[in-house]
From Swiss-Prot:
This is Probable manganese efflux pump MntP. GO terms for molecular function: manganese ion transmembrane transporter activity. GO terms for cellular component: plasma membrane. Probably functions as a manganese efflux pump. Disulfide bonds: none annotated. It comes from Salmonella typhimurium (strain LT2 / SGSC1412 / ATCC 700720). Pfam families: Mntp. Keywords: Cell inner membrane, Cell membrane, Ion transport, Manganese, Membrane, Transmembrane, Transmembrane helix, Transport.
Length: 188
């Protein structure tokens, strides 16, 4: 695959994580750059691994993976988005939330997995092309690191303007990503 195509693929694959990061940044009470970088690193690491996993699965069982990846992503994103909406409606004070609760590792990993299943599907497709899968996966991971960190920082500035609605908006964004994944699968 040509360098330009790899870069375009990498940034294209990072867009779901970018959108989710904006939502996450908006829901946190004044996230610091270190939190944004942590989010970017987690999203980037997961987004690096998923095309590699997809590539391996593509060699073994591409039909099953392609038939189910959109449903898995949809269910995960609907669950996470619904949870964020419910928490946003219930309210509560941002100051009462501990940093671990607000930005837990496992919540970030789950969100990262949900937004990177399309990268796994791309990895399946790459199994049938002449590509350097390691270089391509690293490019996708680096682009996701950059875009997710940037998304968190953008969300940081949007969040105070939205107040409690930020968590609801973040949930709607995740649900929207899930619906978009399902829509794209059924409507090309």
């Amino acid at each position: 695959m040509h360098f330009t195509a790899t870069v375009l693929l990498a940034f294209g694959m990072s867009m779901d994580a970018f959108a989710a990061s904006i939502g996450k940044g908006a829901t946190l009470h004044k996230p610091k750059f270190s939190e944004a970088l942590r989010t970017g690193l987690i999203f980037g690491a997961v987004e690096t691994l998923t095309p590699l996993i997809g590539w391996g699965l593509g060699i073994l069982a591409s039909k099953f993976v392609l038939e189910w990846n959109h449903w898995i992503a949809f269910v995960l994103l609907i669950f996470l988005g619904g949870r964020m909406i419910i928490e946003g409606i219930r309210g509560g004070s941002d100051e009462d939330e501990t940093p671990l609760r607000r930005h837990s590792f496992w919540l970030l990993v789950t969100t990262a997995i949900a937004t990177s299943l399309d990268a796994m599907a791309v990895g399946v497709g790459l199994a049938f092309l002449q590509v350097n899968i390691i270089a391509t996966a690293l490019a996708i991971g680096c682009a996701t690191l950059i875009m997710s960190t940037l998304g968190m920082m953008i969300g940081r500035f949007i969040g105070p303007m939205l107040g409690k609605r930020a968590e609801i908006l973040g949930g709607v964004v995740l649900i929207g990503i899930g619906v978009q994944i399902l829509w794209t699968h059924f409507h090309g």
